[in-house]
Amino acid sequence: MAPSSPSSARPTRASGRKRSAMAEEIHQNQEEEEEVVAASTAKRRRKAASSGKKPKPTPKQAKPAVAGMKKKGETEKTEPVVDDVCAEEPDEEELAMGEEEAEAEEQAMQEVVAAVAAGSPGKKRVGRRSAAASGDHVPEFIGSPVAAAEAHSNWPKRYERSTAANKPEEDDELKARCHYRSAKVDNIVYCLGDDVYVKAGENEADYIGRITEFFEGTDRCHYFTCRWFFRAEDTVINSLVSINVDGHKHDPRRVFLSEEKNDNVLDCIISKVKIVHVDPNMDPKAKAQLIEHCDLYYDMSYSVAYSTFANISSENGQSGSETASGISSDDAGLETSSNMPERTATLLDLYSGCGGMSTGLCLGAALSGLKLETRWAVDLNSFACQSLKYNHPQTEVRNEKADEFLALLKEWAVLCEKYVHQDVDSNLAGSEDQEDADTLDKDEFVVQKLIGIRYDGTGRKKGVYFKVQWEGYGPEEDTWEPIDNLSDCPLKIREFVQEGRKRKILPLPGDVDVICGGPPCQGISGFNRFRNRDEPLKDEKNKQMVTFMDIVAYLKPKYVLMENVVDILKFADGYLGKYALSCLVAMKYQARLGMMVAGCYGLPQFRMRVFLWGALSSMVLPKYPLPTYDVVVRGGAPNAFSQCMVAYDETQRPSLKKALLLGDAFSDLPKVENHQPNDVMEYGGSPKTEFQRYIRLGRKDMLDWSFGEEAGPDEGKLLDHQPLRLNNDDYERVKQIPVKKGANFRDLKGVKVGANNVVEWDPEVERVYLSSGKPLVPDYAMSFIKGKSLKPFGRLWWDETVPTVVTRAEPHNQVILHPTQARVLTIRENARLQGFPDYYRLFGPIKEKYIQVGNAVAVPVARALGYCLGQAYLGESDGSQPLYQLPASFTSVGRTAVQANAVSVGTPAGEVVEQ
């Protein structure tokens, strides 16, 4: 595993010893330390640059580094150990975030009410257009009408008689008296299949369409029907077409053919336009010749539903056979063989966290018959990297910034070209002899081996660094050296690069089949009061979206799956969501965007997230898996993305499983106290529900091949069943919260609920104090959300769900208390709410483990997506429909046949709303 990015000061053993001091001392002595480091480094580098040998330091025993992780004393300031105890009071940010969540919840409810009042958009296409008639000419049809039998056969709905009781509406299809094959407008003859410009509204660019019908309506008016082409700016991408971020640019001559059609009066036609269809996989030279003499070209189709840009199956523009519902399914069920799949694909997990997304994708792909291997992972959080590496030992896990990872990939390609692809033996022939012939100074020694590589983009000397193992010294004396310092060691560099390329420690373009990741966009956070609404990408906190797309552009994987919060579709008119979609389309990827709710795939939490598929034109565009559990989806999306919710149509009545509740998830786990120091323990009981039996399965039964055919460590043990320890004051408070559904701080002595559900002090009850002298009911609880909140010290219940799994476990302003115990939910309980298998072990302080779990993509959602990915990769789906109905056996694959013990967990609480 690669270490974290180096700090601004060059790490040496001298600086490493200083950096092992307390953080306060580091801060006070930082400038002095940098001067010392700079001086010592300069001297040593002069020696190394001339000889490739290292000055001998004063030996010192170093603390052992965590396996696969960076030694803190060498390359960065030591991070203080986080105290795994709940803070005494919520800080200002915590309270503000809570109020922001409450406001968002209220706004979501208002959106739902407004949507209900306005009527459901259903499947209405928002891309409809009506052209404005103009001109003084008299357009006319040419020739005889199409034979009646042929016309009735080709356009049957045009000749259906409408009942007198039904008044025609705007969306109703016009009725025809007869059809024609050609027409004349402004003395120009137009035929069926011609591409034309059509008059648009005022201040709008002319529409572009393909004529599919000429007919005389029952009202004696002359009409034509157009199948519309969309410019990039006419699609959901909209204004993002004009931006230019790191080469992201659309070809103005490129248009997209849609299935959208409208009827317009004949004199709306302006002129012909020459449009050619280009195979997206055509050779660039042939493509350039083909489009040289045309006005426009198209290589993909566009659909408003799921903001889809996809291949066109044939040159005549037919989009293939589509079912009426837009849903495909596999009634054959799943193969449940325990053998490892034969077909393999490689995965790069960016912003991986502890690996929830890639783990789920691999599990789902295995069910489809594809062995998807997480070969590389990148994340800035060292604890998350440690967790991922432990659970996926074959993965090259890099603890570094994504932009430095990209810079390293480009430098790695240069090194591979120099030391692997070219014949460098002649150039290096005398290098080893020269190195051996050099006389060693008494304060120097020889480079034994290079054992790591990274890119430093923040230090004084930017560029590639190698981790050097020095001859005669142990691993605690390894150091990072810039490549310039190793100019006299080309054989060592060649040896490292050739071995690294053989092992593929870093991917080159063409090595990666799938890239997944969720680039953080903290610049759109509600707590960020300085959000840049006009140009979100200029906010440094949103730049990772650009980096993610830059990595995609460089590596050109077959598939891309980006996950993010729904706010990317809401903030600044969906700027970031549109940017991501626009980038993929500009890079000639097929693309599709959908919103999925975790609870719909077998979890007792809501959590709605955005998932963006991308697929090379040579591959099948994956579908979205339809829900398998009966969860009511609430909370809308902006109008531009109103048709992107992955759900069944309102008219459909699918057979879904009953929504899961908290009791289904963790009612089998043993009781633990507020302070639980053991991260490994026994279950002490059997599973009680189907979910619990499944979540306890081992890796092989889950089709998790991270450890090959072998069972992984700790299987069968209960891991990370530890709560964040409440401080003494909060523990006293929690012990007085009643064990009942809906209990919270309002049940404590001295609190009274007044008008409008606002809490107030009970004048008849003297204020109660804790043993520390602090009040039983803290002031912040009384004032939170203007006294209307039910969240402070709120207790969950067995028959409920949670809106989302949080990254912090403090009970001050959220409902997170265990249903029957005086503590918050444990890490394992939260992990189950995210669908992590029980064998998945986490590393780091307790607070860090909560963060890893809360930031992860829900594993069952990723698993369902992985199944659809596998089907597309293997060519077992055609990509023509956006949705896929999972086989009935999908939710029970791999589960044991043991009957569940009866357990009463209540009934579903009904609709759930994301907060």
UniProtKB/Swiss-Prot annotation:
Task: Tell me where in this chain the SAM-dependent MTase C5-type domain is found.
Answer: 345-876
Q: What protein name does the entry list? A: DNA (cytosine-5)-methyltransferase 3
Q: Where is the composition biased (Acidic residues)?
A: 81-107
InterPro entries membership: BAH_dom (IPR001025), BAH_sf (IPR043151), C5-Methyltransferase (IPR050390), C5_DNA_meth_AS (IPR018117), C5_MeTfrase (IPR001525), Chromo-like_dom_sf (IPR016197), Chromo/chromo_shadow_dom (IPR000953), Chromo_domain (IPR023780)
Q: Which gene encodes it?
A: DMT105
**UniProt keyword annotations, A-Z:** Chromatin regulator, DNA-binding, Methyltransferase, Nucleus, S-adenosyl-L-methionine, Transcription, Transcription regulation, Transferase
Name the species this protein comes from. Answer: Zea mays
Indicate whether Lipoprotein appears among the record's keywords.
Answer: no
**Enzyme class, first EC level, given as a word:** transferase
